[in-house]
Amino acid sequence: MPPKSRGTGPKKTQKARRRDKKNVPHGAAHIKSTFNNTIVSITDPAGNVISWASSGHVGFKGSRKSTPFAAQLAAENAARKAQEHGVKKVDVFVKGPGSGRETAIRSLQAAGLEVGTISDVTPQPHNGCRPPKRRRV
């Protein structure tokens, strides 16, 4: 078995992928708000992601990711990127118990997207997994 070469061969350069601008006037905004983070994804009607942002992606770390302000900035960032692809109207699907739910919806409206329907798609267990123990503060 020949010894492995340590980067002495020719370098393979990867061609940068070109993002083509889609023209999607109507989409869906999926807001997943957990106790630790908020993730906003804007998709086309088929479910393909057009743009996304999260509290951590916007620049917050640790416990600041779970704040409503971080969710607001994440939603504005995702909305701005989606508007570059022609999105004007969205239906909002909210999932999770986090603190950034309402703030993210409001900031989508403030960013210039017209919000059609708002639906809560939080999964409810039919006595599935055992929940985490109660906090004693």
Swiss-Prot record:
Q: Which NCBIfam families match?
A: PRK05309.1, uS11_bact
Any GO MF annotation of the entry: structural constituent of ribosome
Recite the UniProt keywords alphabetically. Ribonucleoprotein, Ribosomal protein, RNA-binding, rRNA-binding
Q: Where is this region: Disordered?
A: 1-31, 117-137
GO CC terms of this entry: ribonucleoprotein complex; ribosome
Report what the protein is called: Small ribosomal subunit protein uS11
Keyword rRNA-binding: yes or no? yes
Q: What does this protein do?
A: Located on the platform of the 30S subunit, it bridges several disparate RNA helices of the 16S rRNA. Forms part of the Shine-Dalgarno cleft in the 70S ribosome.
InterPro entries given for it?
A: Ribosomal_uS11, Ribosomal_uS11_bac-type, Ribosomal_uS11_CS, Ribosomal_uS11_sf
Query: What domain of life does the native source organism fall in?
Result: Bacteria
Kindly state the subunit structure of this protein: Part of the 30S ribosomal subunit. Interacts with proteins S7 and S18. Binds to IF-3.
Q: Which organism is it from?
A: Rhodococcus jostii (strain RHA1)
